[in-house]
Amino acid sequence: PYGAGPGQGTEYNGAYGLTSAELATWHRPRLEILANTHADFLLAETIPSILEVEALTSEFARFEKPAILSITVADGKLRDGSSLEDVAAIVRGSQLAGLGINCCTTADALTALRILAPLSGLPLTAYPNSGESWDRVARQWVGNQDELSLVDSVPQLVKAGARFIGGCCRVTPQHIAAIAEQTQGCQNKGCQK
């Protein structure tokens, strides 16, 4: 997200003070460089702002390369407080190859999937954090790494509409291996909706 540039934590709240057009202008040269690589697709992740969703959806339309947009959520909304229904309205019918949810709790990912699955018209992906939370004041991870929460929730994530599942902050290779095992179990047992 744009917010990772200033480094003031705005990547988690979307309080950029920029318009959608200004965000598009900021993203454009970076996307042009990435679109001209051998990458199979483009992925913009941890997007906290409805204005950045608008800007990136518009900018991705300029390129032939498939693109996925992944948002960060809390309590059934984007981090800037915008509704997920508004996100779905922007991306529905767009050229995007998928819509993701990342850098959040597993519970928040499940809530977002349940809202977006019937509305977005796109394949969905979910890659939540390990279960710990970032304390901005103490500048450290706090709480328990709840591996079982993420790993054990794979069937729920699939049932909620996730077609691709992974992990974000503090997720280890061991978590990913366990997620892959759970996903394989879903394929064998039929965890679909």
Predicted segments with their positions:
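Domain-level signal for soluble alpha/beta catalytic cores
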Residues: 1-193
